[in-house]
Regions:
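Active-site helical microenvironments for divalent-metal-assisted chemistry
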Residues: 1-178
Length: 178
């Protein structure tokens, strides 16, 4: 237990360091680290998830995609399993955005259970954020498009965690109208 908690705190510190100069796209330019912390909170508080590897991966989920972190660095610091989960939920930023979004939908059914949990928490947090504090410049149409795309991703991996899926559905029910 003590070593699991230490690993979780190590992941939090690592993510905070890697994301230290990043901000969310909302009008308040919230500190980016709030997002990975929110994922871990959703997994624990709403999903009852206590798998340390999943929680660490949630905290680290955007480090490969949005920072200069390498998979090798994650493996050295957190082990192969956590690095693999993070890699499964990482988009290839070299691809055009539309292709990345399409691949997320396509691959959602094939990723590991652990990666599905992280992806589910990510989509819950993101659509809640879009509903409450949309990114600057996003009109209602763009917000609806994001909600609908997130639902297509989640629909491809239904059955992984019913409680979290209900949380996603509740968040999706707040889809902007218009």
């Amino acid at each position: 237990m003590k070593s699991e908690l230490a690993l979780l705190l190590k992941a939090l510190a690592f993510a905070a360091r890697k994301h230290r100069d990043q901000r969310r796209k909302d009008a308040a330019a919230s500190p980016y680290i709030n997002h990975p912390i929110a994922l871990a909170n959703v997994l624990v508080k709403e999903g009852g998830v206590d798998d340390t590897a999943v929680l660490c991966a949630a905290l680290l989920h955007d480090t490969l995609e949005d920072t200069a972190t390498t998979r090798k660095e994650l493996q050295r610091s957190f082990g192969t399993k956590i690095a693999a989960i993070v890699a499964e939920v990482t988009d290839d930023k070299r691809l055009p955005k539309a292709r990345r979004k399409s691949l997320q939908v396509k691959h959602a059914a094939r990723i590991s259970r652990e990666a599905k949990l992280v992806k589910l928490a990510d989509k819950i947090c993101n659509i809640r954020d879009v509903a409450r504090r949309p990114p600057t410049g996003w009109d209602k149409r763009r917000q609806r498009e994001y909600f609908d795309w997130a639902k297509r991703v989640i629909d491809r991996m239904r059955g992984v965690h019913p409680r979290l899926e209900r949380a996603f559905d509740a968040a999706y029910s707040k889809r902007p109208g218009g």
